[in-house]
Design a protein with these regions (language model features):
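A short alpha-helical cap/connector motif
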Residues: 1-88, 92-174
Length: 174
């Protein structure tokens, strides 16, 4: 497993913990986008990218995609699509992730946050906004799972046990 797909196990766990609700992907990738295209045909996928090199167009009616120049352009469209069961946050530039996580907080049941061990992403200033937080520290870069929903937190715990994935729990305020 290379450094670009260390989020795959946590993402799979999130999809099991929150089934059948639409997924949001911020930052398409060589590994995450094909995985989500395979797993989200029944639930729907909204995927946004700002780099033409990584952008993949829609694969069907169940998938909506946008290539944006600036991340701020996505907000009217992303919010018009409704709420999301899972969001993968793995886009560039680094500090944009914290801005978008804070804005998505009330629209997503479970966040999958890549690169949680690194200060360059600005997570320290916002991670306390989520009551339940875990990190998959079994591979670098780390991937976090963040939620404010008690039922989702319980589902994450059960899915982690079932999958054999060891998660490090952080105490949050929510």
């Amino acid at each position: 497993m290379g450094k670009y797909n260390t989020h795959a196990l946590a993402l799979e766990l999130a999809l099991r913990a929150v089934p059948m609700l639409r997924v949001l992907e911020l930052g398409q990738g060589r590994y995450s986008t094909p995985l989500l295209m395979q797993r989200c045909q029944e639930r729907g996928l909204v995927s946004v990218e700002n780099n033409p090199k990584y952008y993949r167009p829609s694969a069907g009616a169940w998938m909506q995609t946008r290539l944006v120049r600036e991340w701020e352009e996505m907000w009217p469209w992303v919010l018009a699509c409704g709420s999301y069961g899972v969001a993968l946050v793995d886009h560039a530039p680094a500090l944009r992730r914290a801005v978008d996580l804070a804005r998505l907080r009330d629209h997503v049941w479970l966040m999958v946050v890549h690169d949680t061990e690194s200060a360059e992403y600005g997570y320290a200033g916002i991670r306390e906004q989520w009551r339940w937080r875990w990190d998959d520290r079994g591979r670098r870069p780390w991937t976090g799972l963040w939620t404010n929903r008690e039922g989702v937190a319980a589902a994450v715990g059960l899915a982690a046990i079932a999958s054999g994935l060891t998660l490090t729990r952080e105490q949050g305020q929510g």
